[in-house]
UniProtKB/Swiss-Prot annotation:
Pathway: Carbohydrate metabolism; D-tagatose 6-phosphate degradation; D-glyceraldehyde 3-phosphate and glycerone phosphate from D-tagatose 6-phosphate: step 2/2. The lineage of its organism: Bacteria, Bacillati, Bacillota, Bacilli, Bacillales. The keyword Translocase does not apply. The keyword Lyase applies. Its EC number is 4.1.2.40. It comes from the Bacteria. This is Tagatose 1,6-diphosphate aldolase. Keywords: Lactose metabolism, Lyase. SMART domains: DeoC (SM01133). It comes from Staphylococcus aureus (strain bovine RF122 / ET3-1). GO terms for biological process: 6-sulfoquinovose(1-) catabolic process; D-tagatose 6-phosphate catabolic process; lactose catabolic process via tagatose-6-phosphate. It catalyses: D-tagatofuranose 1,6-bisphosphate = D-glyceraldehyde 3-phosphate + dihydroxyacetone phosphate.
Length: 326
């Protein structure tokens, strides 16, 4: 693994003693505001958002190897985290311009890799929407953008975690059967691309290569993949990159995410951990809005703890150390 000693030390700060990244994701901004807005009539305030992130950091970071936060609303939470919990900070603006084609990436204009590092980040995380089948006119802009961030992170000697979310402009619903059919190729080809040395990515944060709701044995309705086909997609994903890679939870339930990790492991995917967000903490949002801070804290200490504890047990049996990847 051709990483600097400083980068290796930083990734170690984000991992547990077994070399597994069991990270809590709470860099949601737009999605979090929408979740909160479902339970109150007024617009969520900055103070409300910041305080919920603080609560989650105070209650759950003792069980996570690291936490991913955003520098817009998450800095108080970064100060509230457990002293042994590493810190990733997000560098991208939330969401994308729905009126423009291509879901082009955009950095937070007040931040840089240098500033995120000065803020105490052990790594920089950037989210990229990518469709390997989009036009070269769109994709060349995205490649150049990621090259810039990679070079910034090399200059600052800080790990670069690239999160890739796939899409297809011709299939508006990425939960559909149509998208499920094209997802494996889109996920795995994007991983292959951004593993190239020119991008200077250190860890990939990726989707599982199938929609588990359409896998035989998991599906309640239509089946898109047999178990064997789904397993092959996970195998293909593992050989698509030489880099450490971790799974995102994509908003599915805690139970489904844990079952997915077991399936991935049985299929032969040697993934190196997770950055799990809503599957762990989403139930706290409604409690926080409707019943207040103390009730939310109680939810985090009980259900939230169970979610993260169960996940950690599954990771112990399924994930492998990032140090084993070459």
């Amino acid at each position: 693994m051709s990483k600097s000693n400083q980068k290796i030390a930083s990734i170690e700060q984000l991992s547990n003693n077994e070399g597994i990244i069991s990270a809590l994701a709470f860099d949601q901004r737009g999605a979090l505001k929408r979740m909160m807005a479902k339970h109150q009539t007024e617009e969520p305030t900055v103070a409300q958002i910041e305080q919920l992130k603080v609560l989650v950091a105070e209650e759950l970071t003792q069980y996570a190897s690291s936490i991913l936060l955003d520098p817009e609303y998450g800095l108080p939470a970064s100060d509230a985290r457990n002293k042994d919990c590493g810190l990733l900070l997000a560098y991208e603006k939330t969401g994308y311009d729905v009126n423009a084609k291509g879901r082009l990436p955009d950095c937070l204009v007040e931040w840089s890799a240098k500033r995120l590092k000065e803020q105490g980040a052990n790594a920089v995380k950037f989210l990229l929407y990518y469709d390997v089948d989009d036009t070269e006119e769109i994709n060349v802009q995205k490649k150049a953008y990621i090259e810039r961030i990679g070079s910034e992170c090399v200059a600052e000697d800080i790990p670069f975690f690239l999160e890739v979310l796939t899409y297809d402009d011709n299939i508006p619903d990425n939960g559909s059967v149509e998208f499920a059919k094209v997802k494996p190729r889109k996920v795995n080809e994007a991983m292959k691309l951004f593993s190239e040395p020119r991008f200077n990515v250190d860890v990939l944060k990726v989707e599982v290569p199938v929609n588990m709701k359409y896998v035989e044995g998991f599906a309640e309705g239509e089946v898109v993949y047999t178990k064997e086909e789904a397993a092959q997609h996970f195998k293909d994903q593992d050989v698509a990159t030489h880099l450490p890679y971790i799974y995102l939870s994509a908003g599915v339930s805690a139970e489904l995410f844990q079952e997915t990790l077991k399936f991935a492991h049985e299929a032969g995917a040697k993934f190196n951990g997770v950055l799990c967000g809503r599957a762990t903490w989403s139930g706290a949002v409604q409690v926080y809005i409707e019943q207040g801070e103390d009730a939310a804290r109680e939810w985090l200490r009980t259900t939230g703890f169970k979610n993260i504890d169960d996940l950690n047990k599954v990771l112990k049996d399924t994930a492998t150390s990032w140090k084993q990847r070459k």
